[in-house]
């Protein structure tokens, strides 16, 4: 049986997490920790304004938490800067769900499949080295067009696939989570919200493996 996972960011405003928990509609939450205003030339990651509150509140009410960062890196130097910033945001916190690298930006398209796939694999392996369960987030069209999905470089990592439709997609490569809508409604959230099916019990897997806590260097 799949788990229902909600993901939120600053765009959902101030959430009443007691209401979310009481609704019984959500088994876990993916929080945006890092946004990005990079233009392809200069890396400009920033903390999502709601991240600290959302993390504290989810922890308080007992909702399993994962996190994602929006990456716009187009080379290794930018990737290292964004990764360092992302890790700083996560250090000292623990996550029951995966830590996702979000790859879907316009500035990354000109790199070509091979280069962007290699850069993405590098970012995922770095995140994994922090002692968390690394996950790739991307859209169905973006993944098929700009990444070598199902290839050797990305094969070690689960995919969180965005494809808004009523039937489960069949892209020809495996994925562990499916973000199926951006217009769900959940008590306690004043806006539409993204919702996903998780086909693995990530909380159990992460706990069993002793993963999830991000420590400083």
Predicted features by range, described:
Residues 46, 55, 68-70, 85, ...:
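Sequence-level detector for tyrosine residue identity
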Residues 43, 66-70, 100-108, 136-138, ...:
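Low-complexity, flexible helical/coil segments
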Residues 97-171:
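Catalytic domains of cell-wall/extracellular-matrix polysaccharide-remodeling enzymes
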Residues 37-38, 74, 143, 168, ...:
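Flexible, glycine-rich phosphate/dinucleotide-binding loops
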Residues 1-130:
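Substrate-binding cleft of extracellular glycoside hydrolase catalytic domains
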Residues 1-19, 23, 27, 150-217:
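Functionally critical loop-and-helix segments that line ligand-binding/catalytic clefts
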């Amino acid at each position: 049986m799949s788990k229902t996972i909600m993901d939120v960011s600053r765009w959902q405003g101030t959430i009443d997490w007691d209401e979310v928990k009481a609704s019984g509609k959500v088994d876990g939450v993916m929080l945006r920790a890092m946004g990005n205003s990079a233009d392809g030339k200069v890396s400009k990651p920033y903390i999502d304004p709601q991240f600290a509150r959302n993390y504290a509140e989810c922890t308080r009410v007992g909702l399993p938490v994962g996190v994602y960062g929006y990456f716009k890196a187009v080379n290794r130097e930018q990737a290292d800067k964004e990764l360092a910033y992302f890790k700083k945001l996560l250090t000292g916190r623990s996550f029951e769900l995966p830590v996702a690298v979000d790859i879907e930006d316009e500035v990354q398209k000109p790199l070509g499949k091979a280069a962007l796939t290699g850069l993405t694999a590098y970012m995922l392996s770095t995140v994994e080295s922090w002692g968390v369960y690394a996950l790739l987030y991307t859209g169905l069209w973006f993944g098929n067009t700009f990444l070598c999905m199902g290839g050797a470089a990305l094969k070690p990592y689960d995919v969180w696939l965005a494809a808004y439709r009523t039937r489960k997609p069949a892209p020809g490569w495996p994925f562990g989570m499916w973000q199926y809508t951006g217009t769900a409604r959940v008590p306690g959230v004043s806006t539409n919200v993204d919702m996903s099916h998780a086909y693995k019990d990530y909380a159990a897997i992460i706990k069993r493996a002793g993963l999830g806590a991000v420590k400083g260097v």
